[in-house]
Each structure stands twice: as structure tokens, then as C-alpha cells.
UniProtKB/Swiss-Prot annotation:
A biological-process GO annotation: translation
Stored NCBIfam families: S21p
CC annotations in GO: ribonucleoprotein complex; ribosome
PROSITE patterns noted in UniProt: RIBOSOMAL_S21 (PS01181)
Alphabetical list of InterPro entries matching this protein: Ribosomal_bS21, Ribosomal_bS21_CS, Ribosomal_bS21_sf
Keyword Transmembrane helix tagged: no
UniProt key word Ribosomal protein: yes
Gene Ontology terms, MF aspect: structural constituent of ribosome
Name this protein carries in UniProt: Small ribosomal subunit protein bS21
Family statement drawn from the similarity comment of this UniProt entry: Belongs to the bacterial ribosomal protein bS21 family.
Gene it is expressed from: rpsU
Pfam families reported in the protein's UniProt record: Ribosomal_S21
């Protein structure tokens, strides 16, 4: 879990920007979106192989 403490004389916008950067760096939002709905293992394998095929070509 990302945590950001607002520094002295720091605007909320700057603190929010630091928080967003920390969240994107850890991949938290992507993980939440990925796990929003249950995905059957067969579908997960199919997506994984399609992604590998897409990377190859």
C-alpha cells in the first residue's frame, strides 16, 4: 500500500502527484483492474499465450 505524507509547505497537488507516481510505480492500480472480475484459468492461459504471440511479432 502506497503512503504519502504531505511535507511542510507542500501543496496538495504536489503531494497528489507524488502519490500517483508511487501508485503507478508499484503497479497497484493495474493489479486492481486485473482482479476486478474473476478470470477462469483457461482464459488466463489464453490471454497469456496471445500476449506472448503479440510480443513475438
Amino acid at each position: 500500500m502506497s503512503k504519502t505524507i504531505v511535507r511542510k509547505n507542500e501543496s496538495i497537488d504536489d503531494a497528489l502527484r507524488r502519490f500517483k507516481r508511487a501508485v503507478s510505480k508499484t503497479g497497484t492500480l493495474q493489479e486492481v483492474r486485473k482482479r476486478e472480475f474473476y478470470e477462469k484459468p483457461s482464459v488466463r492461459r489464453k490471454k497469456k499465450s496471445e500476449a506472448a504471440r503479440k510480443r513475438k511479432y
